[in-house]
């Protein structure tokens, strides 16, 4: 929801400035990631990917943090966010590290013209040009044993793909 809002806002601002909007950012559908505290608290073997209340107590700060991640245009910007938050709020909890990792996944997918990154079970389902990206006629498989490692594995798979 919030990513879509940021995307629409960015396109509206670009339109008002007379800029052509790029194709937007990639969409993530990862069945092993909880993007809200409530979903994570309900249990299950999920990777937390959000800014927790315990790390940034004010909702305005958390909203701004999510906005800044959604608007990051490079891996350097993501690293700058990580450093700024570490300086201001202390060591990043795993949920924030994972949220930054999801932002990096979106950037890498967008850079490689992959509008959709989806994981169902062990299958990594990437779309490019309206078709699924298959390796040897099959979807790539994730092998990492835990959800946090699976996020890193998705990013590694994308980094190995050629840009088109």
Per-segment meaning from a language model:
Residues 1-164:
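Accessory helical-bundle/CTD segments and flexible terminal tails appended to RecA-like ATPase motors
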